[in-house]
Amino acid sequence: MDALDASKLLDEELYSRQLYVLGSPAMQRIQGARVLVSGLQGLGAEVAKNLVLMGVGSLTLHDPHPTCWSDLAAQFLLSEQDLERSRAEASQELLAQLNRAVQVVVHTGDITEDLLLDFQVVVLTAAKLEEQLKVGTLCHKHGVCFLAADTRGLVGQLFCDFGEDFTVQDPTEAEPLTAAIQHISQGSPGILTLRKGANTHYFRDGDLVTFSGIEGMVELNDCDPRSIHVREDGSLEIGDTTTFSRYLRGGAITEVKRPKTVRHKSLDTALLQPHVVAQSSQEVHHAHCLHQAFCALHKFQHLHGRPPQPWDPVDAETVVGLARDLEPLKRTEEEPLEEPLDEALVRTVALSSAGVLSPMVAMLGAVAAQEVLKAISRKFMPLDQWLYFDALDCLPEDGELLPSPEDCALRGSRYDGQIAVFGAGFQEKLRRQHYLLVGAGAIGCELLKVFALVGLGAGNSGGLTVVDMDHIERSNLSRQFLFRSQDVGRPKAEVAAAAARGLNPDLQVIPLTYPLDPTTEHIYGDNFFSRVDGVAAALDSFQARRYVAARCTHYLKPLLEAGTSGTWGSATVFMPHVTEAYRAPASAAASEDAPYPVCTVRYFPSTAEHTLQWARHEFEELFRLSAETINHHQQAHTSLADMDEPQTLTLLKPVLGVLRVRPQNWQDCVAWALGHWKLCFHYGIKQLLRHFPPNKVLEDGTPFWSGPKQCPQPLEFDTNQDTHLLYVLAAANLYAQMHGLPGSQDWTALRELLKLLPQPDPQQMAPIFASNLELASASAEFGPEQQKELNKALEVWSVGPPLKPLMFEKDDDSNFHVDFVVAAASLRCQNYGIPPVNRAQSKRIVGQIIPAIATTTAAVAGLLGLELYKVVSGPRPRSAFRHSYLHLAENYLIRYMPFAPAIQTFHHLKWTSWDRLKVPAGQPERTLESLLAHLQEQHGLRVRILLHGSALLYAAGWSPEKQAQHLPLRVTELVQQLTGQAPAPGQRVLVLELSCEGDDEDTAFPPLHYEL
């Protein structure tokens, strides 16, 4: 088959987050691919939606069947107006709107052998087994990648056949390992020592590696990949280097990923010899039983011309009998598996198989779409070959609570597909719910779709509130499928809410654009949360997650929470008094705001991350903080004599350094940029080496420049070096923007201008302060001459126009922000012999961009939707709930029961994080003395310290006089006196914290809820 023209320019802005997952080569192959999706019920719609969002070149839809009521429970592209229309034709326009760069067409005829030759990948969903076998055989014959996917109620099935000789070019999601080189010996073998702190542990015997940036032993640079041997001390044998030049410094060693070959069986063979994706032998047996259940369901439909009726015991027993009579599965062509059939499992599958559920098709459709991408891009290992997924734990554990055939009968309702599994009574429960969704980004959009289709809050007494303060950006459109290009710049919450109402007109959804954080507790307070039945969080910040989780714990609300990073995803559920409360992963939470040590970043960087943080700080200091400082001085009209020492310190560096002279034109900006280049990468390094010479030795004889400390070398400016020129171009343009001057993007003219400019005088440049101590010392020596010079400079700045502080914007590649940071970091890497990272990775690191892809977000939303069923159904034991973690790149999915809440004790008391001490304020309101007495009499607690936030209400160690001032006051009166704030209108509880006599330091007492 011929691919589309894949040479067309890749829209990096649109696919920016996806590119961090797949890379440009894979994306080029994706946008040149042709895919056929046959079957446009809920599952097919999910597969198609994900492929369009991710930019597949051409998508052909095939489904001539008319839309029916049960489709609307999971097919978000259809509406009541589409009843009796062809599902493919009714879906085409909305799919095309998701991404105008994708050709979305409809095929109305049969699927023929000639038709299949037009595609690289063919996907069948909800197809009869006979159709699967026919199409699968033809695809296998012609080398067309083939997928078959289906869901039956709470069970899903996915089959992949990529042929007998399919090469995966890039099997893993991880970036190739790169490490800095310390030394390479001449010999056979040559021994390469990695710089201390490099990831030596991750290199393995037999790895193929390449080399770059080496000075001296240049023969290794860009040579063919070499195989390595890892020695016991962590050094690497890299082959014969006897004849190579002597190693001098620098360089990096980089892993070369090895392709892998996959051999798949055709569907007709794999039906009897199924190879299933499973994590244990128990899961293998479970999957084999589900495999037989699907085969029996196909046979039932073939015999009766219909699927089993919802919860019909007679039909279910017929399916069990058909499963018993199936030909036994085989381990090999000759060896049977000899596994017992789990008839109870098959029976349950059959009873609930008539339904179609939005969360199930979202989950399986995401996995199927990811497999399509693997087939096209040859990136990541494909499934081998069957995947079975079930969420039968959504059903009540008590058999007496299972729905009846009458409760599950078709009603001509948009929820018929869901009613067939859970019954009409459960549907009404869903419609009466009031839920809060925090975050309307990628996961939030997918959750809104699930909520709309399942009917959450769609009744007259139900409701759904969507909170998001952000506005839509173009880079959102490849994942956040409720948004369109015309929505860019509009509030996410408002657009998402309107789009969700379009999916289900009955949905009672309210958008709010106020953030949910400590500053808005007067909005999202006691009254607000009293109306909420549960919370779903779709946030990309651990700080925000922790806050929302704390509110759920405070108000005893169930929390559904999901997150993604690339093809990694998690979906977790937290139930009051049933599971543990949410805790952010310590490593992730700590890394969110933890900077590297200042001295490391400024003077002793050893990784590209260090240089990027330095470059980012340079941007802030040069183009934002200095401008804000001058503007503040202009507005305050402050003379130097009126300033205290800290103010002088604040102005000293920017005025005498960064902003020494106000530029008048583009040439002045270029001259400034060249001077700053010299300051940072030449003179600054020379001055550092005067402080710490290359031969400096510590008292114990250890060289100062050793281990992670790499001795830097000053750079010489060279207009023929693109990185040198990019720095000056970006810095000059940013300086011009800050001063309201026109810039330039002409590289040729810049080269010519630089030849004419005089070389900067190092004596006229800003002083380098190697530490805050030096800066303070410079201020201490600030005599009359320096004061006179600064006053003169301040007078010059005070009469000019205000400066424009620049706020770093990572997603606009035309503004020179990222250009400056990338160039500065790369030059810093050259100074210190550090392997640099490419522009894309630099942008990801400095912009703190989370790699994202539509498939992962859809999968975790589906998994959360399944947990929603359990939360809404009523009291369920902890064994019913599941935390889920998945890695689509490696076909990994684990679901496990949440932990129980940890129990703490103090004397006779026991509590968990879900408990609290409740004390009514009373009428008239009790005093502090009364509150303390109540706690001692009712709970046996002698309070040592009582706090409200940071306000200390009581301390047992206070003097009698101090206690006499506080004890007679009413609690709210005391709080207002100490904080200056009375309880907010509608506030029902004051939260107090206490510690008691006799407790250990680590005892965390439950919060005291003082009920107003």
Swiss-Prot record:
Upregulation: By DNA damage. Upon interferon-alpha exposure.
Active-site residues annotated for this sequence: C599
Family matches, as InterPro entries: E1_4HB, E1_FCCH, E1_FCCH_sf, ThiF/MoeB/HesA, ThiF_NAD_FAD-bd, Ub-activating_enz_E1_C, Ub-E1_IAD_1, UBA_E1_C_sf
Keyword Kinase listed: no
Q: Name one GO cellular component term.
A: nucleoplasm
List the pathway annotation.
Protein modification; protein ubiquitination
Q: Give the record's GO biological process terms.
A: DNA damage response; innate immune response; ISG15-protein conjugation; modification-dependent protein catabolic process; protein modification process; protein ubiquitination
Where the sequence repeats fall, as residue ranges, is 23-159, 423-575
Spell out the subcellular localization from the entry.
Cytoplasm; Nucleus
Location of the region described as 2 approximate repeats in the Swiss-Prot/TrEMBL record:
23-575
CDD domains to which the protein is assigned, alphabetical: Ube1_repeat1, Ube1_repeat2
Binding-site residues, ATP: 442-471
What modifications follow translation? ISGylated. Ubiquitinated by RNF170.
- What general EC class does the enzyme of this chain belong to? ligase
Question: What SMART domains does UniProt report for this protein, alphabetically?
Answer: UBA_e1_C (SM00985)
Q: Does the keyword ATP-binding apply?
A: yes
- Keywords in UniProt for this one? ATP-binding, Cytoplasm, Host-virus interaction, Ligase, Nucleotide-binding, Nucleus, Phosphoprotein, Repeat, Ubl conjugation, Ubl conjugation pathway
Output the Gene Ontology terms for molecular function. ATP binding; ISG15 activating enzyme activity; ubiquitin-protein transferase activity
Assembly and partners? (Microbial infection) Interacts with human cytomegalovirus proteins NEC2/UL50 and UL26; these interactions inhibit ISGylation and cause proteasomal degradation of UBA7.
Q: Which family does it belong to?
A: Belongs to the ubiquitin-activating E1 family.
Q: What does this protein do?
A: E1-activating enzyme that catalyzes the covalent conjugation of the ubiquitin-like protein product of ISG15 to additional interferon stimulated proteins (ISGs) as well as other cellular proteins such as P53 in a process termed protein ISGylation. Plays an essential role in antiviral immunity together with ISG15 by restricting the replication of many viruses including rabies virus, influenza virus, sindbis virus, rotavirus or human cytomegalovirus.
Further comment found in the protein's record: There are two active sites within the E1 molecule, allowing it to accommodate two ubiquitin moieties at a time, with a new ubiquitin forming an adenylate intermediate as the previous one is transferred to the thiol site.
Which named protein is this?
Answer: Ubiquitin-like modifier-activating enzyme 7
Species classification: Eukaryota, Metazoa, Chordata, Craniata, Vertebrata
